[in-house]
From Swiss-Prot:
Belongs to the amidase family. GatA subfamily. It is an enzyme of class 6 (ligase). It comes from Pseudomonas putida (strain ATCC 700007 / DSM 6899 / JCM 31910 / BCRC 17059 / LMG 24140 / F1). SUPFAM superfamilies: Amidase signature (AS) enzymes. Allows the formation of correctly charged Gln-tRNA(Gln) through the transamidation of misacylated Glu-tRNA(Gln) in organisms which lack glutaminyl-tRNA synthetase. The reaction takes place in the presence of glutamine and ATP through an activated gamma-phospho-Glu-tRNA(Gln). Heterotrimer of A, B and C subunits. This is Glutamyl-tRNA(Gln) amidotransferase subunit A. The lineage of its organism: Bacteria, Pseudomonadati, Pseudomonadota, Gammaproteobacteria, Pseudomonadales.
Length: 483
């Protein structure tokens, strides 16, 4: 059963080939057997999962037919889950049990999905390798000596290892798309405001967006259907009708205009990845797409702008973790200042402390205009570049990452080298655009992804192109040895 996709599970549950309780029991056993090799879960919620599975079976027996009813899911451990530890991968929240469900968790539970657990992640979603977690690094199922990407590395590794068919993730600078690329999955970052952020512990509030990780575009469409929609509890949520994402999966690509930004193919891109991108372009051309070169002239400024804006927002968001109200508190503080200082110094890991310091510096009186305001101006230029490009093309295509997955620890001592791995993904977050990564081949036995970007609220178009591509290629069907 572990080889089934979400769509196949939906069909199996509908025709009573197996029950949700049987499926849940089998997957929980598989997680306990195999996860110690990859460390993709922080919490496994056996009792909750079996109770939800029995409830889903009862709902189906009573005549309900929802497509996600009884299907399994695991949530990245920054989505609040009522009564279950929500750690954000940090010592700071090691003992925190959320008193409510995040909107995404609530919506999927309402649809009848069964929560198997909470997945490992970079601490407070800050990282591109899933090495900064308080609970230890996650390993890539394709090669256990390599990283799975981050910050949704646990969510990606769990699906890649066939521990379950799909997971939720979040994407602030590529944290769904980059691990999807490095573990041979399909990962979708929706338009900013498409999926509610309520109950999603914030890293950078103007960039964060929740989305699905699965093996196929078809599965991502099913999951996005359950996650998307307006939420009055999230002030950044947008009132935009949610289309039927599955209905447009098979639409023709005839005449679809795809742009290849020349800036994507310069120095820094592994030439073997460039070749795989070109191979995917040829497949899409065979399906009727028209490909042309375009320019995104301000892309070179994206990383410096992002690494001012995101840490600035993080320094503000993470100020709430002070040892007073909830989370980690140091032993026997001398006074209030000592409580703040030691609780935060002991509770936050090195990368989180680094980004808080950078953000606080960028927001300080003497540097605010020079750094933060300038970064926001660059952000506007990047958005304008995309708007101009989408006057000429329907979609933008390129590599998801400049390199395949690197070895564990290889970039730990050089944070900037890790930051540069986000070069192709962060522009979509700065502009708020939807983006998808899909499997496109292998380099040295490690997966490679191709990224598609679309205009606002065109997730259906991204899923359509990825689905048609997956009908004529088999990269997405390949599984790592031993799993």
């Amino acid at each position: 059963m572990h080889q089934l996709t979400l769509a196949e599970i939906a069909r199996g549950l509908a025709d009573k080939s197996f029950s949700s309780e049987e499926l849940t029991g089998a997957l929980l056993a598989r997680i306990k057997q195999l996860d110690p090799q990859i460390n993709s879960f922080i919490s496994i919620t056996d009792d909750l999962a079996l109770a939800q599975a029995r409830a889903a079976d009862a709902r189906r027996a009573a005549g309900e037919t929802g497509v996600l009813l009884g299907a399994p899911i695991a949530h990245k451990d920054l989505f609040c889950t009522n009564g279950v530890r929500t750690s954000c991968g940090s010592k700071m929240l090691d003992n925190f049990k959320a008193p409510y469900d995040a909107t995404v968790v609530a919506k999927l539970a309402e649809a009848g999905m069964v929560t198997l657990g909470k997945t490992n992640m970079d601490e407070f979603a800050m990282g591109s390798a899933n090495e900064s977690s308080h609970y230890g690094a996650v390993k890539n199922p394709w090669n256990l000596e390599h990283v799975p990407g981050g910050s949704s590395g646990g969510s990606a590794a769990a699906v890649a290892a066939r521990l379950l068919p799909a997971t939720t993730g979040t994407d602030t600078g590529g944290s769904i798309r980059q691990p999807a690329a490095l573990t041979n999955l399909t990962g979708l970052k929706p338009t900013y405001g498409r999926v509610s952020r309520w109950g999603m512990i914030a890293y950078a509030s103007s960039l964060d967006q929740g989305g699905p990780l699965a093996r196929t575009a078809e599965d991502c469409a099913l999951l996005l259907q359950g996650m998307a929609g307006f939420d009055a509890k999230d002030s950044t949520s947008i009132e935009e009708p949610v289309p039927d994402y599955s209905a447009s999966l098979n639409a023709s690509l005839q005449g679809l205009r795809i742009g290849l930004p020349k800036e994507y193919f310069g120095a820094g891109l592994d030439p073997r990845i460039a070749d795989l991108v070109q191979a995917s372009v040829k497949e899409l051309e065979k399906l009727g797409a028209v490909v042309k070169e375009i320019s995104l002239p301000n892309m070179q400024h994206a990383i410096p702008a992002y690494y001012v804006i995101a840490p600035a927002e993080a320094s503000s968001n993470l100020s709430r973790f002070d040892g007073v109200r909830f989370g980690y508190r140091c032993e026997e503080p001398k006074d209030l200042t000592d409580l703040y200082k030691r609780s935060r110094g002991e509770g936050f890991g090195v990368e989180v402390q680094r980004r808080i310091m950078v953000g606080t510096y960028a927001l300080s009186a003497g540097y605010y205009d020079a750094y933060y305001v300038k970064a926001q101006q660059i952000r506007r230029l990047i958005k304008n570049d995309f708007m101009a490009a989408f006057n000429d093309v329907d979609l933008i295509l390129g590599p998801t990452t400049p390199n395949p997955a690197w070895k564990l620890g290889a970039k730990s001592s050089d944070p900037v080298a890790a930051y540069l791995e986000d070069v192709y993904t962060i522009t979509a977050n700065l502009a708020g655009l939807p983006g998808l990564s899909m499997p496109a081949g292998f380099v040295d036995g490690l997966p490679v992804g191709v990224q598609l970007l679309a205009p606002y609220f065109q997730e259906g178009r991204l899923l359509n192109v990825a689905h048609r591509y997956q009908q004529v290629t088999d990269w997405h069907t390949r599984a790592p040895n031993g799993f």
